[in-house]
Amino acid sequence: MADRATLSMRSLVIAPGANPVTQTIAPGEIVGLAGLDGHGQERFLKVLAGLERPAGGDVTIGARAITSFRKAVASGIAYLPRDRRATGIFPTQSVLDNFAVSTLSRDMRFGLLSFAARRRRYESYRDKLSIVAPRPDASITTLSGGNQQKVLLARALALEPAILLLNDPTRGVDVATRHVLYDVFRGLAADGMALVILSSEIEEILLLCHRVLVFREQQVAAEITGDEMKSDTVIAAMFGRAA
């Protein structure tokens, strides 16, 4: 895993006219993002991933500024996209190729790709995430939606990040897979990884996260922690009213 570091946002503005956000996310912390669709939580997550530019302020991990996706990855940030079919999987490629695309440089031996090293890496994450696939060279499209999502998560984890950004990670997966993923997320946090989870399901956020940032009109409308972590409180903040 990359060195543990704090993800910091200083006077971060995700849309013109919105209030700035100043936050830190510490190693081992799971922070949830909630809000009505289109109210800024997804843009905020993509800014943290270096996929979109903010209207103002900055994002840093340690002393490194995150100004692009490439810099985010190099600094120990991994991002799991929301729509696995459109922006995650490569549908014409195998399970193994989909897994290994982000770590090709780590599987090189004397300037040549080591297929054995690549397969060993895949098998390690296959076992950790309980990926069910007929064989590594099977098409990724032969897998269930839940197992496709596990392959994408394995791809992100193979980068050995310090910070994992998850965009609706259980969207469209079965209940059994959800609980496998929940256990994985908790284990990663226990090992010191910081996680930021955007979810369209409030109960999921409350189940997994230490605190919740609720977005409304492109800014953080509320930060909810401790005994206030209840569905009614989150929903009230989403609609701009008191709980």
Ranges and model annotations:
Residues 1-243:
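Glycine-rich phosphate-binding loops of nucleotide-dependent enzymes
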